[in-house]
Amino acid sequence: MDNSNKIVFVSGARTPVGRFGGSLAGTENHVMGAHALRAALERGGVPAGAVDEVVIGCVGQVGGDAFLARRIALAAGARPESTAVTVNRLCGSGVEAIRSASLEL
């Protein structure tokens, strides 16, 4: 079997859950997301440069976070040629991101 076109889910990770004004208040969204993405890639044994697309679920991105998945992917070491998709389905964003990614397979 030719593995050059093989598409797989390798792992998943989520950002920490904090409280309003808590210890994570000064951490930018894309920095936290990049930590989660790097952790998922490390768990799956995949180098960041091998990623073709990143799908991230996030609620309420605005301003500099309008294309949060792209910022996360680049901060985690993905190639500039890779693509990224941010899914905003309010409370269901994470689950919808998984569903959307699976439909692309």
Segments and roles (model prediction):
Residues 1-82:
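Conserved "HGTGT" condensation-loop signature of ketosynthase/thiolase-family condensing enzymes
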Residues 89-105:
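Active-site-proximal alpha-helical scaffold in enzymes
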Residues 81-91:
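Short pre-catalytic strand/loop immediately N-terminal to key active-site residues, enriched for Gly-Thr
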